[in-house]
């Protein structure tokens, strides 16, 4: 489950029109949501408040296995409607499998003029969190320099680092660091430059999207919501997001990228490359409200399935470490998504196969019913298509993963009344002495106004 600060940051990106998904670092986000989800450890509480649309506060406490906590503050230049934990869209609070819409060039902020002078300022976000009792301080500053350029500064200050530095044993110490990041997104290309002060590391990441780039329009949430309004009906005419038909196979787009980093201080370097294929977001009901007179609407609703299964296929390769990874993820039904990944090292011949799934639970089951029969008329009219009842609200998600080398993990995330709950367990089925390695419960509540 996303911490409140992460949820606010994502809301800030969405509110300012920045596409955080068009980054090389997020190339495998869809499969990671199923195969690399984080299970809570111990007992964790979190309470947050938004007294106004610009300022937020958050408090958290870990009761087990040790007692500690933190206090955080967030300020944004633009108003954000973050709602409350009781009415926020649940899928916005968890990492999940998604098929993202085609990338678009970010749009700039509308200009504001007063007495012949431009008075609008660039958007920014300020975040700070202090941990108790360690005194560690985390800070983040993000600002939009231009419609396609964003800068970020992240810093960590830990007073314990100076104490460990004086230790004669040279024990590994929590370090303080500051990192600068500059992101340039044009839709088709996205480049990120980073520099870390602690180890003097320079890095560059680049992602290229092949095919068409979406025009300026409203940002898209995911494939379950509409991606672009259809310009024509289903009677054999293409939608906006459709491309030329292909014989068989999946229809989608390809993205490829790479990263390179170098540290003169540590005398080390690294490089990796990756490629991703993702299907086009489907625009069938209930995402789009097709005309009721469409002759194909009844058959589409009766099946209730997209024209092609939402699918994401990724491959990564690190030549210096010899690591190769391939993942396949797909939504096999409305509420069930599955993923599989195979990792292999060409130097050590070590391999790992991981599988996982996420299943969404709902309050009620949506079903298709016909309209009530109308009174007899002298003139025959075509029968009305079946009506789609509202699909039940999402109440939670169950995630499970297993692999050939790691433990089996199971987690449930949901909403109880006005509180978000996350309950998970990690077990080692091969160990008779300690089959359960960890169990955790996380409770989160936040409100606005």
Curated annotation (Swiss-Prot):
The keyword Transferase does not apply. Its main location: mitochondrion. It is a multi-pass membrane protein. It is found in: Mitochondrion outer membrane. Residues 285-301 have a biased composition (Low complexity). Belongs to the MDM10 family. Lacks alpha-helical transmembrane segments, suggesting that it resides in the membrane via beta-sheet conformations similar to those predicted for other outer membrane proteins and porin. Pfam families: MDM10 (PF12519). Keywords: Membrane, Mitochondrion, Mitochondrion outer membrane, Transmembrane, Transmembrane beta strand. InterPro entries: Mdm10 (IPR027539). Signal peptide: none annotated. Residues 215-244, 282-307 are annotated as: Disordered. One of its GO terms (cellular component) is ERMES complex. The keyword Transmembrane applies. GO terms for biological process: establishment of mitochondrion localization; mitochondrial genome maintenance; mitochondrial outer membrane translocase complex assembly; mitochondrion-endoplasmic reticulum membrane tethering; phospholipid transport; protein insertion into mitochondrial outer membrane. Component of the ER-mitochondria encounter structure (ERMES) or MDM complex, composed of MMM1, MDM10, MDM12 and MDM34. Associates with the mitochondrial outer membrane sorting assembly machinery SAM(core) complex. Component of the ERMES/MDM complex, which serves as a molecular tether to connect the endoplasmic reticulum and mitochondria. Components of this complex are involved in the control of mitochondrial shape and protein biogenesis and may function in phospholipid exchange. MDM10 is involved in the late assembly steps of the general translocase of the mitochondrial outer membrane (TOM complex). Functions in the TOM40-specific route of the assembly of outer membrane beta-barrel proteins, including the association of TOM40 with the receptor TOM22 and small TOM proteins. This is Mitochondrial distribution and morphology protein 10.
